[in-house]
Protein backbone atom coordinates (compact mmCIF):
# COMPACT_ATOMS: atom_id res chain seq x y z
CA UNK A 1 0.00 0.00 0.00
CA UNK A 2 1.28 3.47 -0.93
CA UNK A 3 1.95 5.76 2.03
CA UNK A 4 -0.97 8.14 2.48
CA UNK A 5 -0.20 11.85 2.31
CA UNK A 6 -2.11 13.39 5.19
CA UNK A 7 -3.24 17.01 4.99
CA UNK A 8 -0.44 18.44 7.11
CA UNK A 9 -1.95 21.88 7.58
CA UNK A 10 -5.27 20.54 8.87
CA UNK A 11 -3.52 17.84 10.90
CA UNK A 12 -1.57 20.50 12.77
CA UNK A 13 -4.66 22.62 13.38
CA UNK A 14 -6.47 19.58 14.75
CA UNK A 15 -3.80 19.22 17.44
CA UNK A 16 -4.75 22.63 18.85
CA UNK A 17 -8.41 21.57 18.92
CA UNK A 18 -9.49 25.20 19.32
CA UNK A 19 -7.76 25.49 22.68
CA UNK A 20 -5.59 28.45 21.66
CA UNK A 21 -5.81 31.81 23.43
CA UNK A 22 -5.51 33.74 20.18
CA UNK A 23 -6.45 31.99 16.96
CA UNK A 24 -4.55 33.66 14.14
CA UNK A 25 -4.42 30.44 12.12
CA UNK A 26 -7.99 30.38 10.79
CA UNK A 27 -8.35 31.66 7.25
CA UNK A 28 -11.89 32.99 7.48
CA UNK A 29 -13.75 35.93 8.99
CA UNK A 30 -15.41 36.29 12.40
CA UNK A 31 -18.38 33.91 11.93
CA UNK A 32 -21.94 35.15 11.63
CA UNK A 33 -24.61 33.91 14.03
CA UNK A 34 -27.96 32.41 13.07
CA UNK A 35 -29.63 35.45 14.60
CA UNK A 36 -27.63 37.74 12.32
CA UNK A 37 -28.59 35.64 9.31
CA UNK A 38 -32.29 35.20 10.06
CA UNK A 39 -32.96 38.40 12.00
CA UNK A 40 -35.59 39.03 14.63
CA UNK A 41 -38.60 38.47 12.40
CA UNK A 42 -40.77 35.76 14.01
CA UNK A 43 -42.24 34.71 10.67
CA UNK A 44 -38.81 34.13 9.13
CA UNK A 45 -37.67 32.21 12.19
CA UNK A 46 -40.75 30.01 12.15
CA UNK A 47 -40.20 29.25 8.47
CA UNK A 48 -36.83 27.71 9.29
CA UNK A 49 -38.07 25.96 12.42
CA UNK A 50 -40.70 24.22 10.29
CA UNK A 51 -38.16 22.72 7.86
CA UNK A 52 -38.46 18.89 7.85
CA UNK A 53 -34.97 17.50 8.44
CA UNK A 54 -35.17 15.07 5.55
CA UNK A 55 -32.43 14.45 2.98
CA UNK A 56 -31.76 17.31 0.62
CA UNK A 57 -31.83 16.48 -3.07
CA UNK A 58 -28.56 15.07 -4.38
CA UNK A 59 -28.17 18.08 -6.64
CA UNK A 60 -29.36 20.45 -3.92
CA UNK A 61 -32.67 22.27 -3.92
CA UNK A 62 -33.76 24.12 -7.04
CA UNK A 63 -34.06 27.29 -4.95
CA UNK A 64 -30.41 27.08 -3.91
CA UNK A 65 -29.14 26.25 -7.38
CA UNK A 66 -31.06 29.14 -8.92
CA UNK A 67 -29.80 31.52 -6.24
CA UNK A 68 -26.21 30.42 -6.82
CA UNK A 69 -26.49 30.56 -10.61
CA UNK A 70 -27.56 34.21 -10.38
CA UNK A 71 -24.06 34.97 -9.05
CA UNK A 72 -22.36 33.79 -12.29
CA UNK A 73 -22.72 35.35 -15.72
CA UNK A 74 -24.12 32.84 -18.20
CA UNK A 75 -24.83 30.14 -15.59
CA UNK A 76 -28.10 28.29 -15.05
CA UNK A 77 -29.14 26.01 -12.22
CA UNK A 78 -27.85 23.06 -14.28
CA UNK A 79 -24.30 24.42 -13.91
CA UNK A 80 -24.46 24.25 -10.10
CA UNK A 81 -23.68 21.34 -7.78
CA UNK A 82 -23.82 22.04 -4.02
CA UNK A 83 -21.27 20.09 -1.97
CA UNK A 84 -20.06 19.91 1.63
CA UNK A 85 -17.58 22.76 1.48
CA UNK A 86 -14.87 23.69 -1.01
CA UNK A 87 -12.72 20.88 0.39
CA UNK A 88 -15.15 18.27 -0.92
CA UNK A 89 -15.33 20.15 -4.21
CA UNK A 90 -11.56 19.91 -4.71
CA UNK A 91 -11.56 16.23 -3.78
CA UNK A 92 -14.38 15.37 -6.17
CA UNK A 93 -13.02 17.36 -9.11
CA UNK A 94 -9.55 15.82 -8.96
CA UNK A 95 -10.96 12.32 -8.56
CA UNK A 96 -13.28 12.88 -11.52
CA UNK A 97 -10.79 14.21 -14.05
CA UNK A 98 -7.33 12.93 -13.13
CA UNK A 99 -5.62 9.55 -13.07
CA UNK A 100 -2.21 8.36 -11.87
CA UNK A 101 0.53 9.78 -14.07
CA UNK A 102 -1.48 12.77 -15.31
CA UNK A 103 0.08 16.19 -14.90
CA UNK A 104 -1.53 18.85 -12.73
CA UNK A 105 -0.18 22.40 -12.85
CA UNK A 106 -0.69 24.51 -9.73
CA UNK A 107 -0.09 28.18 -9.12
CA UNK A 108 2.02 28.38 -5.96
CA UNK A 109 1.76 29.12 -3.09
CA UNK A 110 -1.76 27.78 -3.05
CA UNK A 111 -4.13 26.08 -0.64
CA UNK A 112 -2.18 22.83 -0.06
CA UNK A 113 -5.17 20.48 0.01
CA UNK A 114 -5.02 20.09 -3.76
CA UNK A 115 -1.31 19.24 -3.59
CA UNK A 116 -2.06 16.49 -1.04
CA UNK A 117 -4.91 15.04 -3.08
CA UNK A 118 -2.66 15.06 -6.14
CA UNK A 119 0.08 13.21 -4.23
CA UNK A 120 -2.38 10.52 -3.16
CA UNK A 121 -3.64 10.17 -6.73
CA UNK A 122 0.00 9.77 -7.87
CA UNK A 123 -0.19 12.75 -10.20
CA UNK A 124 2.76 14.59 -11.70
CA UNK A 125 2.66 17.95 -9.88
CA UNK A 126 4.19 21.05 -11.47
CA UNK A 127 4.17 24.40 -9.67
CA UNK A 128 4.07 27.82 -11.31
CA UNK A 129 5.25 30.41 -8.84
CA UNK A 130 3.81 33.62 -7.56
CA UNK A 131 7.03 35.62 -7.39
CA UNK A 132 8.05 36.80 -3.92
CA UNK A 133 10.26 39.59 -5.26
CA UNK A 134 7.47 40.97 -7.45
CA UNK A 135 4.70 41.36 -4.88
CA UNK A 136 3.44 37.82 -5.62
CA UNK A 137 2.76 38.44 -9.32
CA UNK A 138 2.39 35.19 -11.27
CA UNK A 139 5.28 33.94 -13.40
CA UNK A 140 3.15 33.78 -16.54
CA UNK A 141 6.00 32.82 -18.89
CA UNK A 142 6.56 29.72 -16.78
CA UNK A 143 2.87 28.82 -17.08
CA UNK A 144 3.17 28.66 -20.85
CA UNK A 145 6.41 26.68 -20.68
CA UNK A 146 5.36 23.90 -18.30
CA UNK A 147 2.08 22.74 -19.88
CA UNK A 148 2.29 19.62 -22.04
CA UNK A 149 -0.05 17.17 -23.73
CA UNK A 150 -0.12 15.34 -20.40
CA UNK A 151 -1.42 18.40 -18.53
CA UNK A 152 -5.02 17.61 -17.62
CA UNK A 153 -5.78 20.41 -15.16
CA UNK A 154 -4.47 23.79 -14.01
CA UNK A 155 -5.41 24.65 -10.42
CA UNK A 156 -5.50 28.27 -9.32
CA UNK A 157 -6.64 30.11 -6.20
CA UNK A 158 -7.99 33.62 -6.87
CA UNK A 159 -7.83 35.57 -4.60
CA UNK A 160 -4.90 33.53 -3.39
CA UNK A 161 -4.44 31.63 -0.15
CA UNK A 162 -2.06 32.44 1.60
CA UNK A 163 -0.97 35.73 -0.02
CA UNK A 164 -4.30 37.45 -0.72
CA UNK A 165 -3.04 38.25 -4.23
CA UNK A 166 -5.64 38.88 -6.95
CA UNK A 167 -4.74 37.86 -10.50
CA UNK A 168 -4.50 40.60 -13.11
CA UNK A 169 -6.34 40.38 -16.42
CA UNK A 170 -3.05 39.54 -18.15
CA UNK A 171 -2.39 36.70 -15.71
CA UNK A 172 -5.91 35.31 -16.13
CA UNK A 173 -5.51 35.39 -19.90
CA UNK A 174 -2.14 33.63 -19.67
CA UNK A 175 -3.69 30.81 -17.62
CA UNK A 176 -6.56 30.42 -20.08
CA UNK A 177 -4.21 30.46 -23.08
CA UNK A 178 -2.00 27.79 -21.51
CA UNK A 179 -5.02 25.59 -20.81
CA UNK A 180 -6.41 26.05 -24.32
CA UNK A 181 -3.07 25.14 -25.85
CA UNK A 182 -3.20 21.64 -24.36
CA UNK A 183 -7.00 21.29 -23.93
CA UNK A 184 -6.71 21.20 -20.13
CA UNK A 185 -9.30 21.99 -17.50
CA UNK A 186 -8.94 24.95 -15.16
CA UNK A 187 -10.01 24.54 -11.53
CA UNK A 188 -10.47 27.97 -9.97
CA UNK A 189 -10.81 28.20 -6.20
CA UNK A 190 -12.70 31.47 -5.67
CA UNK A 191 -13.59 31.25 -1.98
CA UNK A 192 -12.15 34.71 -1.23
CA UNK A 193 -13.99 36.56 -4.00
CA UNK A 194 -15.95 39.37 -2.37
CA UNK A 195 -13.44 39.91 0.44
CA UNK A 196 -11.53 42.69 -1.29
CA UNK A 197 -9.57 45.09 0.90
CA UNK A 198 -8.48 47.78 -1.53
CA UNK A 199 -11.77 48.32 -3.40
CA UNK A 200 -15.42 47.23 -3.54
CA UNK A 201 -15.18 45.44 -6.88
CA UNK A 202 -15.83 41.73 -6.42
CA UNK A 203 -13.11 39.58 -7.98
CA UNK A 204 -14.50 38.37 -11.29
CA UNK A 205 -15.18 34.65 -11.59
CA UNK A 206 -13.32 32.72 -14.27
CA UNK A 207 -16.50 30.78 -15.09
CA UNK A 208 -17.57 31.35 -18.69
CA UNK A 209 -14.22 32.72 -19.89
CA UNK A 210 -13.20 29.32 -21.31
CA UNK A 211 -15.38 26.27 -21.92
CA UNK A 212 -13.31 24.03 -19.63
CA UNK A 213 -13.43 26.09 -16.45
CA UNK A 214 -14.65 24.65 -13.14
CA UNK A 215 -15.00 27.12 -10.30
CA UNK A 216 -15.61 26.41 -6.64
CA UNK A 217 -16.76 28.53 -3.75
CA UNK A 218 -18.14 28.06 -0.25
CA UNK A 219 -19.76 29.75 2.72
CA UNK A 220 -16.64 29.31 4.84
CA UNK A 221 -14.43 32.27 3.92
CA UNK A 222 -15.91 35.45 2.47
CA UNK A 223 -19.40 34.60 3.73
CA UNK A 224 -18.16 33.85 7.27
CA UNK A 225 -20.41 30.81 7.79
CA UNK A 226 -18.03 27.81 7.96
CA UNK A 227 -20.25 25.89 10.36
CA UNK A 228 -22.89 25.15 7.72
CA UNK A 229 -20.27 23.23 5.67
CA UNK A 230 -21.73 24.22 2.32
CA UNK A 231 -19.85 24.82 -0.89
CA UNK A 232 -20.64 24.63 -4.59
CA UNK A 233 -19.16 23.73 -7.94
CA UNK A 234 -19.93 25.75 -11.08
CA UNK A 235 -19.19 23.89 -14.30
CA UNK A 236 -20.72 22.73 -17.58
CA UNK A 237 -23.80 20.58 -16.96
CA UNK A 238 -22.17 17.37 -18.23
CA UNK A 239 -19.35 17.98 -15.75
CA UNK A 240 -21.61 18.44 -12.74
CA UNK A 241 -23.31 15.16 -13.67
CA UNK A 242 -19.96 13.35 -13.76
CA UNK A 243 -18.92 14.85 -10.42
CA UNK A 244 -22.25 13.85 -8.89
CA UNK A 245 -21.40 10.20 -9.61
CA UNK A 246 -18.41 10.54 -7.29
CA UNK A 247 -20.34 12.55 -4.73
CA UNK A 248 -22.75 9.63 -4.40
CA UNK A 249 -19.82 7.74 -2.85
CA UNK A 250 -18.95 10.51 -0.37
CA UNK A 251 -21.61 12.74 1.21
CA UNK A 252 -24.46 11.98 -1.24
CA UNK A 253 -26.24 15.22 -0.28
CA UNK A 254 -25.52 18.38 1.63
CA UNK A 255 -27.35 19.33 4.82
CA UNK A 256 -31.00 20.23 4.28
CA UNK A 257 -30.80 23.04 6.82
CA UNK A 258 -27.66 24.45 5.19
CA UNK A 259 -29.32 24.27 1.78
CA UNK A 260 -32.43 26.17 2.88
CA UNK A 261 -30.53 28.78 4.87
CA UNK A 262 -28.10 29.45 2.02
CA UNK A 263 -30.91 29.79 -0.51
CA UNK A 264 -32.26 32.58 1.70
CA UNK A 265 -29.19 34.60 2.66
CA UNK A 266 -27.40 34.28 -0.69
CA UNK A 267 -30.20 36.13 -2.43
CA UNK A 268 -28.50 39.21 -3.81
CA UNK A 269 -29.82 41.77 -1.34
CA UNK A 270 -28.83 39.63 1.65
CA UNK A 271 -25.55 38.58 0.04
CA UNK A 272 -24.45 42.17 -0.41
CA UNK A 273 -25.07 42.84 3.29
CA UNK A 274 -22.79 39.92 4.18
CA UNK A 275 -20.09 41.13 1.79
CA UNK A 276 -20.25 44.63 3.28
CA UNK A 277 -19.85 43.21 6.78
CA UNK A 278 -16.90 41.04 5.67
CA UNK A 279 -15.11 43.97 4.06
CA UNK A 280 -15.61 46.08 7.17
CA UNK A 281 -14.10 43.37 9.38
CA UNK A 282 -11.08 42.64 7.20
CA UNK A 283 -10.29 46.28 6.45
CA UNK A 284 -10.14 47.07 10.14
CA UNK A 285 -8.01 43.97 10.69
CA UNK A 286 -5.74 44.92 7.78
CA UNK A 287 -5.13 48.32 9.38
CA UNK A 288 -4.10 46.60 12.63
CA UNK A 289 -1.75 44.29 10.72
CA UNK A 290 -0.18 47.12 8.74
CA UNK A 291 0.47 49.18 11.88
CA UNK A 292 1.98 46.12 13.57
CA UNK A 293 4.31 45.55 10.63
CA UNK A 294 5.41 49.21 10.60
CA UNK A 295 6.09 49.12 14.33
CA UNK A 296 8.00 45.84 14.19
CA UNK A 297 11.31 47.60 13.43
CA UNK A 298 12.20 45.15 10.69
CA UNK A 299 11.28 41.98 12.54
CA UNK A 300 8.39 41.38 10.11
CA UNK A 301 7.47 42.47 6.59
CA UNK A 302 4.56 41.78 4.27
CA UNK A 303 3.12 42.45 0.84
CA UNK A 304 -0.32 43.54 1.98
CA UNK A 305 -3.07 41.28 0.60
CA UNK A 306 -5.55 42.67 -1.90
CA UNK A 307 -8.30 40.40 -0.60
CA UNK A 308 -9.05 37.86 2.16
CA UNK A 309 -8.49 38.02 5.91
CA UNK A 310 -5.02 36.44 5.79
CA UNK A 311 -1.51 37.66 5.06
CA UNK A 312 1.71 35.83 4.26
CA UNK A 313 4.15 37.55 6.59
CA UNK A 314 7.92 37.30 6.31
CA UNK A 315 9.94 37.22 9.54
CA UNK A 316 13.58 38.20 9.96
CA UNK A 317 14.74 35.60 12.49
CA UNK A 318 16.94 32.52 12.42
CA UNK A 319 14.29 29.91 13.17
CA UNK A 320 12.39 27.46 10.98
CA UNK A 321 8.76 28.47 10.42
CA UNK A 322 7.35 25.22 11.82
CA UNK A 323 9.45 25.65 14.95
CA UNK A 324 8.33 29.27 15.21
CA UNK A 325 4.69 28.14 15.00
CA UNK A 326 5.05 25.36 17.59
CA UNK A 327 7.14 27.30 20.08
CA UNK A 328 4.88 30.35 19.82
CA UNK A 329 1.83 28.24 20.62
CA UNK A 330 3.55 26.58 23.58
CA UNK A 331 4.81 29.90 24.95
CA UNK A 332 1.76 32.11 24.48
CA UNK A 333 -1.20 30.10 23.18
CA UNK A 334 -1.19 31.94 19.85
CA UNK A 335 -1.82 29.81 16.76
CA UNK A 336 -0.72 30.74 13.26
CA UNK A 337 0.51 28.70 10.31
CA UNK A 338 4.06 28.01 9.21
CA UNK A 339 5.22 28.87 5.73
CA UNK A 340 6.46 25.27 5.57
CA UNK A 341 2.88 24.16 4.88
CA UNK A 342 3.10 26.15 1.65
CA UNK A 343 6.64 25.05 0.87
CA UNK A 344 8.11 28.46 1.73
CA UNK A 345 10.11 28.69 4.95
CA UNK A 346 10.67 32.09 6.57
CA UNK A 347 7.01 33.04 6.31
CA UNK A 348 3.93 32.79 8.52
CA UNK A 349 0.29 32.85 7.47
CA UNK A 350 -1.47 35.17 9.88
CA UNK A 351 -5.20 35.79 10.10
CA UNK A 352 -6.55 39.28 10.70
CA UNK A 353 -10.21 38.54 9.99
CA UNK A 354 -11.19 38.75 13.66
CA UNK A 355 -12.16 41.71 15.90
CA UNK A 356 -9.53 44.47 15.96
CA UNK A 357 -8.52 44.18 19.62
CA UNK A 358 -8.32 40.39 19.37
CA UNK A 359 -5.97 40.62 16.38
CA UNK A 360 -3.94 43.37 18.02
CA UNK A 361 -3.40 41.41 21.24
CA UNK A 362 -2.52 38.26 19.33
CA UNK A 363 0.05 40.12 17.23
CA UNK A 364 1.57 41.65 20.37
CA UNK A 365 2.16 38.11 21.64
CA UNK A 366 3.87 37.24 18.35
CA UNK A 367 6.20 40.22 18.75
CA UNK A 368 7.04 39.29 22.35
CA UNK A 369 7.97 35.79 21.23
CA UNK A 370 10.02 36.93 18.22
CA UNK A 371 12.16 39.34 20.22
CA UNK A 372 14.02 36.48 21.86
CA UNK A 373 15.60 35.48 18.53
CA UNK A 374 18.51 37.18 16.85
CA UNK A 375 18.03 38.68 13.43
Give the role of each language-model region.
Residues 2-85, 92, 268, 373-375:
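N-terminal small-domain helix-loop-helix segment of the aminotransferase-like
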Residues 25, 263, 279-290, 301-314:
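Conserved glycine-rich beta-strand-loop-beta hairpin in the small C-terminal domain of fold type I
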Residues 74, 144, 327-336, 342-375:
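PLP-dependent enzyme catalytic core of the Aspartate aminotransferase-like
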Residues 96-156:
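PLP-dependent aminotransferase-like
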Residues 102, 123, 181-184, 211:
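A short helix->loop->beta-strand "cap" motif at the edges of active sites that frequently abuts
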Residues 121, 181-182, 332, 373:
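Helix C-cap/helix->beta junction micro-motif
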Residues 132-201:
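Active-site phosphate-binding strand-loop segment of PLP-dependent enzymes
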Residues 212-283, 290-291, 364:
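Conserved core segment of the aminotransferase class I/II
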Amino acid sequence: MEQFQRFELEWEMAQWDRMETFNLSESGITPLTLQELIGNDDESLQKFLDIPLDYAGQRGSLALRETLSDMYSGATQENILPVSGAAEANYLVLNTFLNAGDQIVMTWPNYPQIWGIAKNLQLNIVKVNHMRDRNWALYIQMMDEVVTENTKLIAICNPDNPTGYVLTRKEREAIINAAQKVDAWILADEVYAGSEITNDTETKSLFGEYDKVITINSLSKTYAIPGLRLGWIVAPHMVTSEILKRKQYTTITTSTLSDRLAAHFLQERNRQKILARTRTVIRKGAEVLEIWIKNSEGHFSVVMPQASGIAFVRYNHDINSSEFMKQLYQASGVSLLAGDFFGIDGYLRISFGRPEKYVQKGLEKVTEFALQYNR
